[in-house]
Amino acid sequence: MGYSLGIDLGTTFTAAATATGDRTDTFSLGNHAATIPSVVFLRDDGDVIIGDVAQRRGQEQPDRIAREFKRRFGDATPIMLGHTPYSAERLMAAVLQLVSRQVSERNGGPPDAVAIAHPANWGPYKIELLHQAAQLAGLGGARFVSEPEAAAVHFAAGERVDEGDVVAVYDLGGGTFDAAVLRRVGDGFETLGEPQGIERLGGI
């Protein structure tokens, strides 16, 4: 049976979940936790490593590590890892590719569908850049959903939310704050009004 993959690449941590039929499971990306740090480290040989290992290596060579690069999404100024310039989109693509590879290896093949969450206040420009990052990661067919919408879907998986019910979502992440009001429609949600967000307000 095929499966779907959802990815939340946050400012500080990245998480993933898989869905098969009516069953949804958190996918353990790290060795000791479900999430991994959204951190990229450039090795001396030019390869990048991601997550917990990158975090440890960055303590030894802090000039070769990138953290919180989601906040730089759409910024034309490159992020320097050592002497190598990287865009935030390229770093995000590296994390997405790692997640996709781990999930595909453990599930015996690639997912049938992929959804990637993004902050509610991202406009068409940043969503297009996210699409480009997904393409670089081999996820060109991914669907993009706002983080409040993804949170509402997760909530509805465990609580009764009837057709037409309205929910308010307040999402305080590591680097961004989003708020949105959504109405249950069929198997999903529609956003009412304009979602609001503060891009540099979070838990870090």
How should each PLM-predicted stretch be described?
Residues 70, 74, 96-104:
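Amphipathic, well-packed alpha-helical segments that form the structural scaffold of globular domains
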Residues 80-101:
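Adenine-nucleotide phosphate-binding core of ATP-dependent small-molecule kinases
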